[in-house]
Structures are given as C-alpha cells and as structure tokens.
C-alpha cells in the first residue's frame, strides 16, 4: 500500500519530511503485514533541488505535494557519442552525463578528456578555480549536507522494519 493513500501523509514527505514518511511506512507495514517490507527510496528534495536534477520530478519539488514521483526521459547519450561512452565510460559520465543530469554540474562539460590525465591535474587548477566551478562545489557541499541530515533523520528504516519482523 502507498503510505500516502493509506495514512493521508503527502507524497512530498518522502522528500521533505523523513521522520513523518518513516512513520507512515511503518504504519502501513504493521497494518498490512507483508512478507517483505520496503522502506521506500526517500531522498532529500532539498538536495535534488540544489543539484538541479533534470531527469526526475518529485512531489513537493517540481511537482505538487500530492503527485507521484516521475521520471523525465531525457536523451543523455546522443547518437554520435556511443564511441566516447564505450572508449571511456567514466570520462563520458563526468563530462557529458552528469552535466546533463544535474544543472549544478554543467561546468564539468568544459573539462578536457580525462583518460590521459595521469599527471596533469595541476593544469586543471586554473579552470577549477573559476566562479562557475566554485558554484558547482558549493552546490555539491550543500546537497551533501542536506543528504546527510535527511539520512540522519530517516535512520536505518530497513533495520527498524526488520526488528518489527518484516525483512
């Protein structure tokens, strides 16, 4: 059962009220006694907003508080980029995928190919010290703090459900 339908909590609680969401999940689990319990996949809406997530829409963020979570099908791997991806997937993810998926990471698209940079990091320092990279670093730091706080508040929901007898 959907905690929002059963308990009346807004779906946005999964992103902005981790304690309330955890209580609602526990209430549904105890009421329905499933063979296996799912604590859901709540995440910090504040962190998602800070990062500028482009491929997901969540209640209380880009969507009204009572809407369902949605995926926005954006083309992250363009037809002419398969060779880049297959040659060096890590480079592709950092320089192409992340900047498309997170607006805050757009500056990463300006990085040179990373595959041959075994000892060349010092050459990147001028680029990495620009205001746009500093802004990206601040967004990462803020999102990290939001995520840590969210996780602290939600705790280990799976372990708590297991203690109630729901693996």
Predicted regions, residues:
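Catalytic cores of TIM-barrel enzymes
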Residues: 1-167
């Amino acid at each position: 059962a959907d905690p929002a339908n059963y308990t009346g909590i807004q779906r946005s609680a999964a992103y902005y009220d981790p304690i309330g969401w955890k209580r609602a999940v526990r209430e549904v689990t105890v009421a329905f006694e499933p063979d296996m319990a799912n604590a859901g996949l709540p995440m910090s809406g504040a962190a998602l907003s800070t990062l500028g997530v482009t491929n997901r829409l969540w209640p209380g963020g880009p969507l009204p508080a009572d809407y369902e979570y949605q995926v926005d099908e954006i083309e992250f791997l363009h037809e002419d980029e398969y060779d880049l991806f297959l040659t060096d997937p890590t480079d592709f993810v950092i320089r192409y995928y992340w900047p498309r998926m997170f607006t805050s990471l757009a500056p990463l698209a300006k990085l040179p190919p990373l595959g041959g940079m075994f000892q060349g990091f010092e050459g990147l320092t001028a680029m990495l010290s620009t205001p746009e990279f500093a802004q990206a670093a601040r967004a990462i730091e803020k999102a990290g703090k939001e995520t840590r706080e969210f996780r602290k508040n939600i705790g280990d929901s799976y372990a708590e459900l297991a203690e109630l007898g729901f693996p």
